[in-house]
A protein has these predicted regions:
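Solvent-exposed alpha-helices and their adjacent loops that cap or buttress functional pockets
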Residues: 73-74, 95-97, 111-112, 142-144, ...
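Short alpha-helices
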Residues: 107-173
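Conserved beta-strand segments of alpha/beta enzyme cores
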Residues: 50-52, 101, 118, 141
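Hydrophobic helix-and-loop "lid/oligomerization" segment in the mid-to-C-terminal part
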Residues: 2-25, 29-62, 72-79, 156-306
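Active-site cofactor/cluster-binding pocket
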Residues: 63-117
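An acidic intrinsically disordered interaction segment
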Residues: 1-7, 89-91, 95-102, 123-131
Length: 307
């Protein structure tokens, strides 16, 4: 943790009356939770500031909070804070190159500079953990709602504290958070992991139809008509990749879904050993060493990635 840099970020936040907070395309709970928690903390601390969280809303994650509608941007006077994004091409909601004032906060390996203050902590289990550090080490305020939102991001991105990096520090921080704000962990876990029977049936289909190679690599291409037949959507199907992390027969697994709106294939990749983010980076993606995503336009590109 770099306390002086956290204080510098707080000083920058204090300067600006207009703040835009953005995260990556195809968001997960950590990305959305970090947006909402930071927006709400800044507004709670500075009620007169105009603070917005931008990006496509995802119905599956409405329980976390609301995303603001896009607007005409003030490129000269606004401060942009990017969260959970290592590269510009994955920013959802705006073109960061058009803005004069930018802060980047992330826990992924460094890919490129965004042109302003950069706070990257690869030892953090989530971007929400970094924001917890930011609030704990500055005069930003927190309430029970903000604390709950941060917990959602921390729990989900660490997969219930199973994924590295997880160490004694995060348990100390989370313990204090639960104690101070009397958080209901059972309620939080239910919000994250409760799912309808239709999704469980889809998981059964996936388990029955995944292809597994002799090299312990598993993959499945989930066409939308199959997903829809289970009353699920592509986003929900894609996020099920995390539910297959403890299967002995494979160490790397990959889910493919089709994004009809953007006419491309979304690829979620997970690993229990081999480093995968370097491969994902070659296909318009990236992420962590053992948890990454990619986006490809054609079936030929998809075949290259898989094979």
């Amino acid at each position: 943790m770099k306390k002086e840099l956290l204080k510098k970020i707080y000083s920058e936040i204090k300067k600006y009356d207009l703040i835009y907070i953005v995260r990556h395309i195809g968001p997960d709970p950590d990305a959305i939770s970090s947006q909402i928690a930071l927006r709400d903390s800044i507004k709670y601390t500075f009620p007169d500031k105009k603070v917005y969280a931008f990006g496509a809303s995802v119905s599956k994650f409405k329980y976390i909070g609301h995303i603001d509608k896009s607007m005409d941007y003030d490129y000269e006077n606004a401060l942009v804070i990017t969260l959970d994004i290592p590269n510009k091409s994955r920013i959802d909601g705006l073109n960061v190159d058009k803005f004069k004032h930018v802060i980047k906060i992330d826990h992924h390996p460094f890919v490129e500079n965004f042109g302003g203050i950069e706070y990257i902590d690869e030892k953090a289990c989530s971007t929400c953990e970094i924001l917890l550090d930011l609030i704990n080490n500055t005069r930003l305020k927190m309430n029970e709602s903000i604390a709950r939102t941060l917990m959602i991001g921390i729990i989900s991105d660490s997969n219930r504290f199973l994924f590295n990096p997880v160490n004694e520090n995060i348990f100390f921080k989370v313990g204090n958070l639960v104690k101070k704000y009397k958080l209901n962990l059972q309620d939080i876990y239910s919000s994250i992991y409760m799912k309808p029977m239709s999704e469980v049936r889809l998981m059964g289909y996936i388990a029955s139809n995944m292809k597994v190679t002799k090299n312990k690599f598993a993959y499945i291409i989930l066409e939308n008509d199959i997903v829809n037949s289970f009353n699920a959507d592509a986003s929900s199907a894609s996020n099920m990749v995390n539910d297959f992390s403890n299967i002995d027969e494979f160490v790397v697994w990959l889910f493919v879904t089709y994004d009809a709106k953007n006419d491309l294939y979304k690829v979620n990749i997970r690993s229990r050993g081999p480093v995968i983010n370097e491969i994902a980076a070659k296909y318009n993606g990236g992420g962590h060493k053992f948890s990454s995503g990619a986006r490809v336009k054609t079936m030929s590109e998809l075949d290259d990635l898989i094979l």
